[in-house]
C-alpha cells in the first residue's frame, strides 16, 4: 500500500433511486430515467452506455465462449443492479434480459412499484399487477416455479425455506399451481424479459427504432468484381427515413455501391458523415521501405470510421479518393471489441470456390491463401504487451487481407485497391 486512499463520490439519494428504478415493459425491456436495456440493442451500444455511467453501473462482467464466440451467447452481468443481458452470438443483439438480484433494484409496472429492495415481490403481488395468465410450470431439476405472461416471466423458489409450499398438478405436461398460506408466500427470485412464449428459446429480435439514433446499420456487404479485380463494395443498410411511426423515426433499407476512387463527398452523400475521422499517425510498414525513403512520404492518409456499421474507409490524403475498406466482426477477445457493431459480410473470391463470411473460420478458406500447396505464412500483428488479448495473424492474397485470432475466427477483412500500394 502507498498510503493513498481513493475517494469516490457517492450519488445522492435521488440519483441513486433514479438509476435503480426501472420500468418493466414486457416484450421490450427495462427503462430507467437515465438509460434503458431493450431487446435488440447491439452489444457495442450497450457497452458504450455502461461506460458512460461508471458510478452507477459497476461490478460488470463479460462472459463468452473462447471456443465458439460467434454461436454461443455473450453475457454481460451488471452486479450493481442484478441485471444480466444475453446477446445472440451471431447478431450480437440482446435476446434475453434477466434480473436475478431483486435486492438491488426497484421495478415498476404502469408507473406503480411492485418490487423494491425493502419489499420484494411475492407471487400474489405479481398476479395482482399483471393479471390472469396460464397455469405456471414447475422445474423439477432446479425446484423453481415459473409464472409467465407474453414476453415476461417470474421465477419463485420451491423447497428449502419454502418447503411448506405444495405443488399441485395442472392441466398436463409440467403445468402446476402452488398452494401456500399467507405467511409463507414465495418471494420473487428472477424476472425475465424476452420475445415469444418461452424464455428458454427467445425469438430473434431486430434492432428497435430507438437504438438507431440517426446512424446507419449494416445488413450485408459484398465485393464488386469486374474483370478479375475487386472494384468496390455493395452495401445494404438500414437507416431512418424521416417518417414518424408510433413516436419513432421509421427505418428503410437501402442498397448502395462505393468504388475505389470515389471522393470524400461521394461517400458522404451515400453514408452520411462518419462517426470519426482518424488520421494514420504511424506506418508500421515503413521499415520495409528503407530509411532513404523516409522523406518521400507526405501527410498521412485518413479513415472515415463508421463504428455503428462496422466499417472503416481509407482515403488517400492527396487525392481524397477511396483506397481501402476494412470490415470488422467485433470478435470477443479482440482489442477492438465493443468499439464497432458487427459488419455482416460475404466476400467471394474470384473463382467463387471460397466465401469469406463474418462467421467463417480461417480453415474454411485457407487453401485460397496457399502458395504452391504450401501452408500460408501469416504476418503476426503484435499489440502492446500490457493488453491481455494477445497477437492476431494476418494473411493476404490479391486485394484481400484477413486478420484472425488464435481460435481461427476472423476479426477483420481488409479490401484494398489493387492499383494502389497496400
From Swiss-Prot:
One of its GO terms (cellular component) is phagophore assembly site. Keywords: Cytoplasm. InterPro entries: PHAF1, PHAF1/BROMI. It is found in: Cytoplasm; Preautophagosomal structure. One of its GO terms (biological process) is Golgi to plasma membrane protein transport. May play a regulatory role in autophagic activity. Belongs to the PHAF1 family. This is PHAF1 protein T01G9.2. It comes from Caenorhabditis elegans.
